[in-house]
Structures are given as C-alpha cells and as structure tokens.
A protein has these predicted regions:
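C-terminal amphipathic alpha-helix
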Residues: 2-54, 88, 92-143
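Short, solvent-exposed, charged loop/turn and helix-capping segments
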Residues: 56-84, 133-141
Length: 143
C-alpha cells in the first residue's frame, strides 16, 4: 500500500466517514438540547424516555461508528480521538441525566453539566486540530 497523505486521510475522515456518525450525534443532541432550551413541554418522564429510547442509542451508535473508522495517519488519529472523546462525554452526560431523573439526585445533573463542558472543550480541540491540518494541507473546511 502506498502511504496515504494527511490531506487524503483528513478529507476521507471528515467528508466520507464522519457524516454517518454525525447524523446520529445531531439527532441525539437535538433531543437533549430541546428539553433544556425550554422549548419543550415534555415532562421529565417523557424526556427520560426520549433519552433512553432514542438519544442514548443514537449516541452509542455514533460512538461505534467513529470507533470503527480506520485512519491512516497520526494527525487524523488525533482528530478522531478528540471527536470520539467528546461524543463519549456527551453520551455519559445523557446517562447521568437519566440517573438523575430516576434517583432525583441533583449531583448527577451537576456531573452531566461538567461532562457537557468537557465535551465542548474536546470538540473545540477537534476543530482547532482540524483547522491546523487544513491550513497546513491547503484544504478549505466547511464547518
């Protein structure tokens, strides 16, 4: 096998591999955020059900999809790792919220908030790494 260039690897990862995972992710995050945006008239039990039946399985599917993506370069492996860790944190946060609703333990909500913040930091790290690779390789990234 000829060595895969960083440019080809990043383009394949972002344009071809990631979109399938991103669809699950966006769906799950939409469910999660809708409740907190106050635009939802769901009660907590309905929210818990949508997390358990739809959002968490979608996140787990997203995690599996990303985990199974094969990358050829260290640069893109670092990108994949940041993205994967951010999704894992978000999934953990959703599970914490379900536990908080079940046990009505407010500490779980605080922990979920922390996980979401960590996920945002990791996602930002991913964006920064992606932009650096794009600049280096002369690729235009549509975020």
């Amino acid at each position: 096998d000829a060595a895969v260039s960083v440019k080809d690897d990043v383009v394949e990862f972002v344009n071809e591999e990631l979109p399938a995972a991103k669809a699950d992710h966006d769906n799950a995050i939409g469910i999660y955020n809708a409740y907190f945006a106050g635009s939802s008239d769901q009660d907590l039990d309905a929210f818990k059900t949508s997390l358990q039946d739809t959002a968490i399985p979608a996140m787990e599917n997203c995690i599996t999809t990303i985990s199974n993506i094969e990358v050829a370069t260290d640069e893109v492996k670092a990108l994949k790792d940041s993205y994967l860790q951010s999704v894992q944190k978000e999934c953990e946060a959703m599970k914490m919220v379900v536990s908080a609703i079940d046990g009505e333990n407010a500490d779980y909500l605080t922990q979920a908030d922390s996980l979401i913040a960590e996920a945002a930091t990791l996602r930002s790290d991913y964006q920064t790494k992606l932009q650096a690779i794009a600049n280096e390789q002369g690729i235009v990234v549509n975020q």
